[in-house]
Amino acid sequence: MTGQELAGAEVEADVALAPLTTLRVGPVARRLITATSTEQLVAALRAPVGRDALILAGGSNVVLADDMSDLTVIRVANSEITVRDGIVRAEAGANWDDVVVTALAHGLGGLECLSGIPGSAGATPVQNVGAYGSEVADTIRRVRLFDRRTGRDDWVTPQDMAFGYRTSVLKHSDHAVVLEVEFALDVGGRSAPLRYGELARALDVEPGGRADPVAVRDAVLALRRGKGMVLDEPDRDTWSVGSFFTNPVVTTAQHERLAAEVDGPVPSYPAPDGVKLAAGWLVEHAGFGKGYPGDDAPARLSTKHALAVTNRGHATTADVIALARTVRDGVRTTFGIELTPEPTLVGCTL
């Protein structure tokens, strides 16, 4: 397999994948194909080698097993971002925060609450990326998908995506690959509604109100930095996939039972199908504080945010999974609540 057969895409052999992920763990790929244009990406996906290849973009929401034999990886690195009539179109490999900055530079509001989230634009619809009261489902206009079963690519609408809390039809699909995403934004330059209390207070705005989008971005970045959620190479608290678990949604009865069993308030938020609990609160109150299990551990909970499982510089995937499993099991034992991993686990399970 050569680059000429893949519209010029670079092909490398025996490439360590750990440096290509924010958690910095993973195997050595037998073959790495880097597609820097949509043409190259489609060519790689249509080639026989691409049918079962692992798709990797920003590497910020994936945990790769330590050993995966005979692995071919297609690295999504197409990165063009264009703006027209309030529509931002981003190729799948575009850096997500660059998409946010581009929107703001054109006076467009709607993405600012999602500032500082690592990863690529193409990953955002897969798990309906969200933070601080916003999610990409609020603004996605359409998504261009390649179907590895048929070799076709088509634009689909949000209605086709079945967006939910940190999920979509793409999250558990091995055949649909995002090529491009379009976002329909506020041409009046208004921010998204500020639904998240901590963010609204930081901006001195009533919950549900709006603010200058640039000011919202600055406030979001400050909050994320305080939790070790903005990538910073020297800061090992940022060597993670962000929040390792999603906030669980429980029934009203479960919430009432939990509130009766603990001292003090239980952070919770209304959800369409129940009550959403703060996973970080559950983790800490199950006995897993920031920095657990201690300084000498290769994988630890972040010292800033107990929901992030971090690599302190020499962890393996096995170390990360073992810690995440301990936390999950501890929360289940303490509260009877099951935490669900937020990142995609490849070749490994909890």
Curated annotation (Swiss-Prot):
InterPro entries: FAD-bd_PCMH, FAD-bd_PCMH-like_sf, FAD-bd_PCMH_sub1, FAD-bd_PCMH_sub2, MurB, MurB_C, MurB_C_sf, Oxid_FAD_bind_N. It catalyses: UDP-N-acetyl-alpha-D-muramate + NADP(+) = UDP-N-acetyl-3-O-(1-carboxyvinyl)-alpha-D-glucosamine + NADPH + H(+). Belongs to the MurB family. Pathway: Cell wall biogenesis; peptidoglycan biosynthesis. It is found in: Cytoplasm. The gene is murB. Cell wall formation. Gene3D superfamilies: 3.30.465.10, UDP-N-acetylenolpyruvoylglucosamine reductase, C-terminal domain, Uridine Diphospho-n-acetylenolpyruvylglucosamine Reductase, domain 2. Residues 25-194 form the FAD-binding PCMH-type domain. Its cofactor is FAD. The active site is at 166, 243 (proton donor), 342. This is UDP-N-acetylenolpyruvoylglucosamine reductase. The keyword DNA repair does not apply. Keywords: Cell cycle, Cell division, Cell shape, Cell wall biogenesis/degradation, Cytoplasm, FAD, Flavoprotein, NADP, Oxidoreductase, Peptidoglycan synthesis.
